[in-house]
Regions:
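Mid-domain catalytic core of redox enzymes
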Residues: 24, 230-348, 372-376
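Dinucleotide-binding Rossmann-like beta1-alpha1 core, especially the glycine-rich loop
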Residues: 48-126
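General small-molecule cofactor/ligand-binding pocket signal
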Residues: 80-81, 226-228, 351, 383
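Active-site/ligand-binding neighborhood in enzyme catalytic cores
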Residues: 112-240, 249, 257
C-alpha cells in the first residue's frame, strides 16, 4: 500500500497535521511514532502521586484558530487560567520577578544602581551598530551586568554551547524592553506584564498535567498512528517516485516533524546536505522530579543562571497542577551537565527522564542551513513542519499554527 501522506512523529505538530488532514477528508495517511504514545514533549507522567510534564508546557496563544483547535478537543472548561503567573530569576542571592530588566527595582538600591548604569551605557544607547551574534547583541542591548550575571550563564547552561556560537534570530523569545522602559519601571517600582513575549496568563488543565490535552487530541487519531516505530531507513525510489520508510511503508508525500540530524542518519548521510546538517544541532534535557518536606515557595517556576547549580529551571508542580501531590518540584538540566550523583536541588530525587530531543540550538548559520535543506527536499515531496521540521525554537502553539497553515496552503497549491 502506498500512502498519500506519511507523517514522521506524533508529537503536537504531527498530531495537528494528522487531525487537520483527516478533517479535510484525507484518510490515506499514516503517522510513525518512535514512542509508545503520542504527544512528544507535551506528555505528562504520574510518579508516586506527582505529575511531571516532560516539557513544562502552558497554553496561551494570540491565534484564534489555534485556540479553536485546542478547545475543540479539550474544552476550556477543563482548564483554568494561571493569573498571575509567578516566575522568578535567582540572581544576586535573591529572587527577582521575570523578566529581570523590567524588575531591577526589586534589587537592593546599590545593586540596582549598578545594573541601571550598565543598561544606560549599552551599545545601542551609545549608537554602536547592531551585532550579529547573541553574546555581543545582549551586551549591546542590555549592558554587561545583565549579560554576565544572568543571560550568558543561563543560556550557556540551557543550550550547552558557548554564547558566541548562538545567532540572534531567536531573540524574539526574549522580552524586548527599551532603556526608557527599564528606567520607568525602576522609578515606578512596577512592571508591565503585557511585555511578556508569551504566557503571561496561560491556561493549564484542571487535572492530570498538560499531557491530558495531547491525549484528547490524539484520541480519534490512534488508528492512523503506528507506535514504537523509529525511522531507521528512508530512501526515495526514483522509479516509483515514492518514499520508502524502513523498507515497509511507501508514501507519495512525507512530512517530517522530527529532528533532521536523526533523519539524515536514516537517509544514509547524503553528501548533498552534509554541510547544512552540520549546522543543525539539538540538545537533550533531563527532567528530574524531587519531593520536599514542605512547599518552599508559591512560584510557578524559577530560572537558575548560577553555574554552580546543575539545573537551569525549577517548576513547582503542586502550585499549578491541582491534582498533583504536595511538595513536588521538577527541574530541567541540559543532559551534558547532568550527574545523578551531584544533583544540586535540595529534595528527594524520585525520577529522572532524558528527552530524546529538547531544543533546536540556534547556532549561527542555522537558519540558512535549514532553509537549504527544506528547499532541497521540497521537489521530492519531503517537507518539514514544526519545532523539529523547521528547526526553530517554536512554542507548541506556533507548532500548531504552522501545521494548520501547512495543510491549508498545501491543499491550495
Amino acid at each position: 500500500m502506498t500512502y498519500e501522506y506519511l507523517i514522521l512523529g506524533a508529537g503536537i505538530t504531527g498530531l495537528t497535521l494528522l487531525k487537520k488532514m483527516r478533517q479535510k477528508g484525507i484518510n490515506n495517511i499514516l503517522a510513525l511514532e518512535a514512542e509508545k504514545e503520542a504527544g512528544g514533549l507535551c506528555r505528562s507522567f504520574y510518579v508516586e502521586g506527582h505529575v511531571v510534564d516532560i516539557g513544562g508546557h502552558f497554553f496561551q496563544t494570540k491565534y484564534k484558530e489555534v485556540e479553536d483547535f485546542i478547545f475543540a478537543s479539550f474544552p476550556k472548561e477543563k482548564m483554568y487560567k494561571i493569573d498571575p503567573r509567578i516566575s522568578k530569576i535567582s540572581i544576586e542571592g535573591m529572587d527577582v520577578d521575570y523578566p529581570l530588566e523590567s524588575n531591577l527595582w526589586q534589587l537592593p538600591v546599590d545593586k540596582q544602581i549598578k545594573y541601571l548604569i550598565s543598561v544606560i551605557r549599552n551599545g545601542e544607547a551609545l549608537g554602536k551598530p547592531e551585532p550579529k551574534n547573541y553574546e555581543e547583541w545582549i551586551r549591546w542591548k542590555l549592558g554587561d551586568m545583565i549579560c554576565d550575571n544572568y543571560l550568558l550563564p543561563y543560556n550557556t547552561k540551557l543550550w550547552g554551547v558557548t554564547p558566541d556560537e548562538l545567532d540572534v534570530d531567536w531573540i524574539y523569545k526574549i522580552p524586548r524592553v527599551e532603556v526608557e522602559e527599564v528606567l520607568r519601571y525602576s522609578l515606578e517600582r512596577q512592571q508591565d506584564v503585557e511585555k511578556y513575549p508569551c504566557h503571561n496568563r496561560p491556561y493549564y488543565p484542571l487535572s492530570g498535567g498538560y499531557g491530558r490535552v495531547m491525549e484528547a487530541i490524539a484520541k480519534d487519531e490512534l488508528q492512523n498512528i503506528k507506535f514504537n516505530t523509529k525511522v531507521t531507513k528512508l530512501r526515495f525510489d526514483e522509479n516509483e517516485q515514492v518514499w520508502v520508510i524502513n523498507e515497509e511503508y511507501k508514501a507519495k508525500n512525507v512530512i517530517n516533524t522530527t529532528p533532521w540530524p536523526d533523519l539524515y542518519e536514516a537517509m544514509g548521510r547524503p553528501e548533498a546536505i552534509r554541510e547544512q546538517i552540520n549546522k543543525i544541532k539539538y540538545n537533550k534535557v533531563v527532567v528530574s522530579l524531587f519531593e520536599t518536606d514542605d512547599n518552599p515557595t508559591n512560584y510557578h517556576w524559577r530560572y537558575r543562571p548560577e553555574m554552580e547549580q546543575q539545573h537551569h529551571r525549577e517548576l513547582y508542580i503542586s502550585n499549578f497542577v491541582k491534582d498533583s501531590k504536595n511538595y513536588g518540584v521538577f527541574t530541567e538540566t541540559n543532559a551534558n551537565r547532568f550527574d545523578a550523583n551531584k544533583v544540586t536541588f535540595k529534595g528527594r530525587n524520585l525520577f529522572n527522564y532524558t528527552t530524546p530531543a529538547a531544543y533546536p540550538i540556534p547556532l549561527v548559520g542555522r537558519t540558512v542551513a535549514i532553509t537549504a535543506i527544506l528547499d532541497y527536499f521540497k521537489s521530492k515531496h519531503l517537507y518539514g513542519v514544526g519545532r523539529w521540521g523547521e528547526h526553530q525554537h517554536h512554542n507548541h502553539d506556533i507548532c500548531i499554527k504552522h501545521a494548520l497553515d501547512f495543510v491549508d496552503n498545501f491543499q491550495a497549491s
